[in-house]
């Protein structure tokens, strides 16, 4: 099956009777890709394969990995997505190398450390959207700065993360401004800032509404019911994986992630894409450490990789099933990017805004 755009995939997710979410898993190497696609085939789920660490595996390598996966698993629609693009050149380079979707993160300036103004965000995101839509590619934007409401700080990940102290006005997406932003930029999906952050150390306690503001998602969905919302930094950081890692030589402090139940709540209110990376890293690392400690004479990297891939496959399948993604791959007929470009040009995919009902 051909690669699919993010817009078509998330439209399909929103059009189902109950709606479903699609986890976006970072792919940095072959083993992660094989684990994700094995899980997808087992439960008939479409896939968003996201490139996060650009310096680790560049556009060309990842494109060929995903092309190979698409050939091996022709029954699975795969969206090849670039995460946290820092400027137009990064986004357009990804599209030129075969990515069907890009994220323009204009919440930060090009250094990915300095908080950007709203006008800067609108301007650069709109420019990327205009260019991407000409060729049928999808664009995700971000409004508000990802980070911990507890600490007032962002967690740097793969070179991306605001520096310095932040206040809640910066770290919570304003629902009214979200409407303006979507109308001005015509993004296909909108990443929301509501207390999640990158990395493992998201919360010092089980999150509640004070530090994980799910109400923001609900308020934005009420105003933008047709806009696909995105939760970043949504690994659950399961205690089981923390314990597995620490039982085999690590010293990982206790931490809390985003409960899967809260993600399911978000899906009921318009969240269609859910970014998950730390959970996959932990699944892999736990098994690496287990093999290293239990078989100290082992030197064959494959003996480390195989159980690690199985652990990650189980985690990925669980998310496909919990988010309602399972069972939908075979229901999707991919629309070519040229046809998506025509739909953008016609205005058929312009954003819709909820109108207030008369009293």
Swiss-Prot record:
Cofactor(s) required, per the database record: Zn(2+)
EC number: 4.1.2.13
Annotated binding of dihydroxyacetone phosphate, by residue: 199, 233-235, 275-278
Superkingdom to which the source organism belongs: Bacteria
Keywords on record: Calvin cycle, Glycolysis, Lyase, Metal-binding, Zinc
Residues at which Zn(2+) 2 binds: 105, 142
Cofactor comment text: Binds 2 Zn(2+) ions per subunit. One is catalytic and the other provides a structural contribution.
Cystine bridges: none
Active site per the UniProt annotation: 83
Pfam families named among the record's database cross-references: F_bP_aldolase
Any one GO BP annotation for this protein: glycolytic process
A molecular function (GO) term: zinc ion binding
Purpose: Catalyzes the aldol condensation of dihydroxyacetone phosphate (DHAP or glycerone-phosphate) with glyceraldehyde 3-phosphate (G3P) to form fructose 1,6-bisphosphate (FBP) in gluconeogenesis and the reverse reaction in glycolysis.
Note: This protein is encoded within the form I ribulose-bisphosphate carboxylase operon, which predominates when carbon dioxide is limiting.
Subunit-level organization: Homodimer.
Similarity comment: family membership: Belongs to the class II fructose-bisphosphate aldolase family.
Protein's name in the database: Fructose-bisphosphate aldolase 1
Lineage per the UniProt record: Bacteria, Pseudomonadati, Pseudomonadota, Alphaproteobacteria, Rhodobacterales
